């Protein structure tokens, strides 16, 4: 495993003509990241993992400061997985001396997380733009848990590059809660409670697929679980996130707070 702290040095030493899969992360690695890496290793000759906590995608400075970091633990995990290349760039290395460019997203995309986290996805697309401009990657691997992010990056890359986007399924703990770096900020009681809510969400989705227009049970679910402060609970088309849904294309999306920590999920 070769570790690079400079994009320039990485480009000088790595032959990007080879089939290279890219797994962008913000560190605090977990089993969800492991699944992305293994998928890349299966599909590509070489795998590059980045660890970069992108300040441009945080609309809350405290959220940025609190984001869990353990670089040595992350590197140990990546070494055990036999990752080929790891990139740990600085903010200046990624963005240069320019201001962190933020892309505008359309009004139709300002839904779900984009509605409640202004500037977040603009920051995400900004850093992805920098990576694809500076790294000649072939494929990028993204997790299903961050589904809205996947859709936006997929559409952005289709318009602006030849990079192929690979969606990887959500990996869950034994209790059903999706692995997330933010889980590390929760105590066991909060994790158990979150897992309980997600299990109820899964059952709700089964009910809703029988009657997609039943708004009553959605409102009832929110009202009965006010302790979690549900930010949104919506049904969307999995192909484009529109509200034109059918039993074949529907997904359910949720964002909620537990002890001040924001979690998202979907089925």
Named regions from a protein language model:
Residues 1-227, 236, 240, 260, ...:
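Nucleotidyltransferase catalytic core that binds NTPs
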Residues 232-267:
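A C-terminal functional module that forms or caps the active site or interfaces directly
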């Amino acid at each position: 495993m070769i570790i690079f702290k400079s994009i320039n040095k990485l480009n000088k030493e790595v032959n990007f003509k080879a089939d290279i899969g890219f797994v962008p992360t913000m560190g605090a690695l977990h089993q969800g990241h492991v699944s992305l890496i293994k998928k890349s290793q299966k599909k590509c000759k070489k795998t590059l993992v980045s660890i970069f906590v992108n300040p441009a995608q945080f609309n809350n400075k405290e959220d940025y400061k609190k984001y869990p970091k353990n670089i040595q633990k992350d590197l140990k995990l990546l070494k055990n997985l036999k990752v080929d290349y790891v990139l740990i760039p600085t903010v200046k290395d990624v963005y240069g001396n320019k201001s962190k460019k933020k892309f505008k997203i359309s009004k139709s995309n300002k839904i779900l997380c984009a509605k409640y986290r202004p500037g977040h996805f603009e920051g995400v697309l900004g850093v992805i733009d920098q990576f694809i401009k500076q790294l000649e990657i072939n494929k990028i691997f993204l997790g299903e848990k961050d589904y809205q992010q996947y859709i936006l990056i997929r559409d952005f890359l289709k318009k602006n590059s030849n990079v192929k986007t690979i969606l990887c399924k959500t990996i869950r703990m034994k209790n059903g809660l999706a692995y997330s770096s933010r889980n590390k900020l929760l105590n066991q009681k909060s994790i158990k409670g979150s897992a309980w809510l997600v299990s109820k969400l899964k059952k709700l989705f089964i009910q809703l697929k029988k009657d997609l227009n039943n708004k009553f049970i959605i409102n009832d679910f929110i009202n009965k679980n006010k302790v979690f402060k549900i930010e949104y609970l919506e049904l969307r088309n999995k192909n484009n996130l529109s509200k034109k849904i059918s039993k074949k294309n529907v997904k359910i999306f949720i964002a909620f707070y537990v002890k001040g920590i924001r979690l998202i999920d979907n089925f």
